[in-house]
Amino acid sequence: VLSGPDKTNVKNVFAKIGGHADAYGAETLERMFTTYPQTKTYFPHFDLHHGSAQIKTHGKKVVSALIDAANNIDDIYGALSKLSDLHAQKLRVDPVNFKLLGQCFLVVVAIHHPSLLTPEVHASLDKFLCAVGAVLTAKYR
């Protein structure tokens, strides 16, 4: 459960990174595909090389969805309901991949904003990313 301070921390982080959705999203995906190569199986039609237009486009979608969730932090479920349907019913993404993506996103934030990622902010972001993952897997059966 996200506390008031957690919500403030998350909103502050996304306020600072919002203008970098495309770059941070692409970097997050590249890290995930490199570190966890099994995640590539969901993207057989993508050019997975560094700088690929497809990775940049999808990365921007990923971070834009996280920004939307942060902007609607009191209703993450409502903000991501359609994505939950898509990932559970059509794409059938293994739920563990959301955690892997979240870990890679935290690394990207830490690289680009090291002073921002205090232990408290890190914990808040981790809780938020877990909440996002829970929403995205809520419709799995």
Swiss-Prot record:
InterPro entries per UniProt: Globin (IPR000971), Globin-like_sf (IPR009050), Globin/Proto (IPR012292), Hemoglobin_a-typ (IPR002338), Hemoglobin_oxygen_transport (IPR050056), Hemoglobin_pi (IPR002339)
Residues that hold heme b according to the record: 87
GO terms for cellular component: blood microparticle; haptoglobin-hemoglobin complex; hemoglobin complex
The keyword Transcription regulation appears for this protein: no
GO molecular function, one term: oxygen carrier activity
UniProt binding sites for O2: 58
A Gene Ontology biological process term: hydrogen peroxide catabolic process
The keyword Protein transport is annotated on this UniProt entry: no
Domain Globin: 1-141
Tissue expression from the record: Red blood cells.
Subunit-structure text: Heterotetramer of two alpha chains and two beta chains.
Family: Belongs to the globin family.
Protein role: Involved in oxygen transport from the lung to the various peripheral tissues.
The protein's name: Hemoglobin subunit alpha-A
Protein's organism: Rhea americana (Greater rhea)
Protein's gene: HBAA
